Amino acid sequence: MTVDKRYYEVAKPGSLSERLMIRARDRIYADFLATCSPKPAETILDVGVSDVLNDGANVLERLYPNQEQITACGLGEATEFQAAFPRVRYRRVATGEPLPFANKSFDVATSNAVLEHVGSRENQARFIAEMVRVARRVFITVPHRFFPVEHHTAIPLAHWTDTTWFLACAVTGKQKWSQDKELILMSARHLSSLVPPGSAHQVGYTGLLLGPFSSNLFLAIT
């Protein structure tokens, strides 16, 4: 199994789940462009690219016209990723280690659906701080806790409270997803609380737009 294949187990190829994921990530890409307005010559760091190649993964690499301006990093060897996107530079990184780039090396840093998997609140704060360190503008997206269906398990509604979430995971045999080391459910308040002090930022809805029940959240730091 590739490093992150388990995160795509719900979205089978050609399924309704995959079609909705593609629609959500296309909107995320549009919001990234609108919020960060990257110019053709500006450099972009994409943190946490996927070893899984499908229409819902690696949206920036699939859609951004200036691929040579992208540096991607991830946990795996990314052999198939590099073959699919030969114009994108790739750096392998280690969990919990600082990003291997100098301060303000990039104009923009982005990360999609990674922050919820880094294991603890402290790790999340460090993850964001590292992105702020290496880039002038930052755009991060995560699944939204209050979307009616939990993204990784397809369990409806139970994830809105910790008690019902733990119970639902136990009943369905999906206990691993109730552990912070696998998944931290993300609300707008929690996401905002992770931002380094003094950083101007905005938290908003993206993905499948349903107001306060939208599928994803974005964090923009400028």
Regions found by a protein language model. Give the residues of each.
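Conserved S-adenosyl-L-methionine
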Residues: S199-L210
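Soluble or luminal CAZymes and related metallo-dependent hydrolases
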Residues: L20-I28, G119, N123, L183-H190
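Conserved class I S-adenosyl-L-methionine
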Residues: R137-T164
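Conserved SAM-binding loop
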Residues: E42-F147, A220
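Short hydrophobic/aromatic beta-strand or adjacent loop that forms the aromatic wall/cage
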Residues: L183, R189, P212-L219
